[in-house]
């Protein structure tokens, strides 16, 4: 059975009220060639059977929860423009990790301003960057370990 035509309602956000400066952790990623393509985001070119999958790890702070259906792209969260998102950060590269060990990462949160307080946190770790479009490589594997929020330093302003 393929994934084409399947849909899911997703709910993002858990109650959370502090203002960290980033997300720290370790990951190990082994991608597969993308062999399942239902849809792709505008501006993204994927050649089924040739394009390597990518992982996605990101964090957002919000003023609400978000519920959307993965088949309705109009409901997808627009992190840069949604006024309910107050901070966002993502792993810069979703490429494969080298060797057998885990790779350390630090994702700085970029705040839209220094005054808004979050009510919810969103953390997403996906072995297929476009999994919400039902597109990815069967067999892509992402392991994540020892996630922690960082509270040191001055918050970065989103520009």
Name each model-derived stretch:
Residues 99-101, 117, 128-152, 157-158:
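Extracellular carbohydrate recognition
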Residues 30-32, 64-66, 112, 128-130, ...:
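Short coil/turn motifs at secondary-structure junctions
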Residues 15, 106-110, 148:
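Generic structural detector for well-ordered beta-strands
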Residues 23-27, 31, 118-132, 147:
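Extracellular beta-strand-rich recognition modules
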Residues 25, 158-159:
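Terminal processing/anchoring signals of secreted or surface-associated proteins
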Residues 19-21, 53-55, 103, 138-145:
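Residues that flank catalytic or metal-binding motifs in active/ligand-binding sites
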